[in-house]
Swiss-Prot record:
Keyword terms: Cytoplasm, Lipopolysaccharide biosynthesis, Transferase
EC number: 2.5.1.55
UniProt xrefs under PANTHER family: PHOSPHO-2-DEHYDRO-3-DEOXYHEPTONATE ALDOLASE (PTHR21057)
Keyword set includes Ribonucleoprotein: no
SUPFAM superfamilies for the chain: Aldolase
Gene3D superfamilies on file: Aldolase class I
Molecular function terms, GO-annotated: 3-deoxy-8-phosphooctulonate synthase activity
Keyword Cytoplasm appears in the UniProt entry: yes
UniProt pathway annotation: Carbohydrate biosynthesis; 3-deoxy-D-manno-octulosonate biosynthesis; 3-deoxy-D-manno-octulosonate from D-ribulose 5-phosphate: step 2/3; Bacterial outer membrane biogenesis; lipopolysaccharide biosynthesis
Top-rank taxon, per record: Bacteria
Protein's recorded name: 2-dehydro-3-deoxyphosphooctonate aldolase
Reactions catalysed, as given in the entry: D-arabinose 5-phosphate + phosphoenolpyruvate + H2O = 3-deoxy-alpha-D-manno-2-octulosonate-8-phosphate + phosphate
Primary site of residence: cytoplasm
Amino acid sequence: MEQKIVNIGDIQVANDKPFTLFAGMNVLESRDLAMQICEHYVKVTDKLGIPYVFKASFDKANRSSVHSYRGPGLEEGMKIFQELKDTFGVKIITDVHTEAQAQPVADVVDVIQLPAFLARQTDLVEAMAKTGAVINVKKPQFMSPGQVGNIVEKFAECGNENIILCERGSCMGYDNLVVDMLGFGVMKNASKGSPIIFDVTHSLQMRDPSGAASGGRREQTVELAKAGLATGIAGLFIEAHPNPDQARCDGPSALPLDKLEPFLAQMKSLDDLIKSFADIDIK
C-alpha cells in the first residue's frame, strides 16, 4: 500500500519517511517557560537531524476538575505561538475545541489538532477542514483502530485530505490505558496509508479513580516509544518539562527535559534501522 505524504511546510510526514517529532509541553504555563522548552527542543532536534513541530495547548478545555489550570486562552496563546515562530522558525501544532477557534488558530499555527474526546463531532470537523490546515486527529480512547477511516473520510468529504492520525492508547477497564501495537497497521489500512503518529505521553496516563488529575508512568516512556516506532510510523508525539513534578498538567506522564537528547538519539537510531528493512508482504 502506498503511504500518503502530508507536508507541513518543508517537512514531509509519512509512515515510510524519517520520523517527525511533534513535541513540546502540555499546556502553555508562561511565555518564558514556552521559550525555554522550545529552544531546547530546537537545539536537540537540529543536532540530531530530526524534523520538528512544537506542541502546546493554549486552552485545556477538557480538564477533569473545574479548579484545574486551563492555559492562557486564545488571544494570549496565539501571541506566544507567533513569538516562538518568529524567534525559532519552528512549526507549531495546537488543539482546538470549538468551531469558532478553528480559523483564528489556523491563521497562526501550522497544524490544528482534533481532540480525542471530540473526534466524532461533525460540526467541529467541518470547521477545521475548511481552514485548509494540516489536521492531526487524536484517536479516541473509546474507538477501535479500524474506525479512524470514518474520520478521515469525513474530513475528505469536507474538502481536506491533509490528515495525520494519532494513537494515544485505548481504555482498558476503568482508569487505565493500553496500546495495541497491532492497531498501528490497522489504522494505516483503514485510512489508506495516512501518516500515523504515536502520542507516547498520554498513553502513559493512569487515572486516580477518585482524584481530579491523571497519574502517569513516565518511567516507561522509552520502552513504549521504541515499541511504537518498531511498527514503522510517521512520528512521535511527546511532552516534556524541566520539572515534571511541578508541571501544571500531566506531569506524571511528562519526559524530564534533560532526558530529551539521549531519548531522541535512541529513537532516531531505531527508526533509521526499522525503515532500512524491505517490506515483507504476507497475505
